[in-house]
Amino acid sequence: MRLAVLFSGALLGLLAAQGTGNDCPHKKSATLLPSFTVTPTVTESTGTTSHRTTKSHKTTTHRTTTTGTTSHGPTTATHNPTTTSHGNVTVHPTSNSTATSQGPSTATHSPATTSHGNATVHPTSNSTATSPGFTSSAHPEPPPPSPSPSPTSKETIGDYTWTNGSQPCVHLQAQIQIRVMYTTQGGGEAWGISVLNPNKTKVQGSCEGAHPHLLLSFPYGHLSFGFMQDLQQKVVYLSYMAVEYNVSFPHAAQWTFSAQNASLRDLQAPLGQSFSCSNSSIILSPAVHLDLLSLRLQAAQLPHTGVFGQSFSCPSDRSILLPLIIGLILLGLLALVLIAFCIIRRRPSAYQAL
């Protein structure tokens, strides 16, 4: 009987122990939080690459953010923050930012933090924003025109007059062409000729004292003439000249040309007379020459009508004219000798045969 009671008591104790096993205070259910990687939502602009890695440990959140931004040209990259919090999170951010900017640019990077429970998050963000800039052309304007062909008529002979009130002070009549030596794309050198169009040329100038000035402006360039009056020698001459223009020659490596010369003494004529020359070349520099064809110029003591005074020929025309005159005189004398010889041969003899 005693054994039965002991056996029943042991059985009841065993059943009671199994029934309360789930409520054992010493047994604890554990929820394991695995390591995780959080990729925040990032709004990317063109040319921006962002990589963010977040690792979870235990107690305190330390975030190190290194941002390198290189911007060329007007670029704006913005990353809006996204924060989701569950539980207690302690964040100690450390941010190192390096920005190199060439041109106006704005870059804003905000971190994204996600926390679950008591966690320590060490996000490492390496963000690089690169925006290619733009290249401005060295020549923003359209290419200049090709040089005009050599003229075959008198249409390119311009008549340019500058008047101070009602009194003209400079009168220029000529066909103007500019010769330049330019470098070709292959590294060689070549001469190019551009002819001035009178219909597209604007005349300006000044008539101050003994230094009259004439400025001819045309598309893509201008010519400047400065004259000097020598009252002691009673002459006037060209003392200064400058040229600047853009023209596109075949296979040229450049199209902007400029030169000036302030030590000239050309186109000299007596006061009150006009200077005339069939072809006068002015050297502004070894690579820039100005040719004045069929030239007629007067820069002092012009009448109110602006008509040219007595013509004063250039030395080159006089040197050609003198041999021509001498040759014509000799040719005339030879013709007279031949005519006299023919007349004598035709005259009958004064003696008659017996």
From Swiss-Prot:
Region entry 2 X 30 AA tandem repeats, spans: 70-129
Segments of skewed composition (Polar residues): 85-102, 121-135
Ranges of biased composition (kind: Pro residues): 140-150
Region of interest (Disordered), ranges: 40-162
Keywords attached to this entry: Cell membrane, Disulfide bond, Endosome, Glycoprotein, Lysosome, Membrane, Repeat, Signal, Transmembrane, Transmembrane helix
Signal peptide bounds: 1-21
Residue ranges of the region described as Mucin-like: 23-140
GO BP terms in the entry: autocrine signaling; cellular response to lipopolysaccharide; cellular response to nutrient levels; cellular response to oxidised low-density lipoprotein particle stimulus; establishment of protein localization to organelle; inflammatory response to antigenic stimulus; negative regulation of dendritic cell antigen processing and presentation; response to ethanol
Transmembrane segments: 320-344
Basic residues composition-biased segments: 52-61
Disulfide bonds listed in the record: 169-207, 277-314
Cytoplasmic topological segments: 345-354
Record's compositionally biased regions (Low complexity): 40-51, 62-84, 103-117
Tissue: Highly expressed by blood monocytes and tissue macrophages. Also expressed in lymphocytes, fibroblasts and endothelial cells. Expressed in many tumor cell lines which could allow them to attach to selectins on vascular endothelium, facilitating their dissemination to secondary sites.
NAD as UniProt keyword: no
Similarity comment: Belongs to the LAMP family.
Function comment: Could play a role in phagocytic activities of tissue macrophages, both in intracellular lysosomal metabolism and extracellular cell-cell and cell-pathogen interactions. Binds to tissue- and organ-specific lectins or selectins, allowing homing of macrophage subsets to particular sites. Rapid recirculation of CD68 from endosomes and lysosomes to the plasma membrane may allow macrophages to crawl over selectin-bearing substrates or other cells.
Protein name: Macrosialin
Organism: Homo sapiens (Human)
Gene: CD68
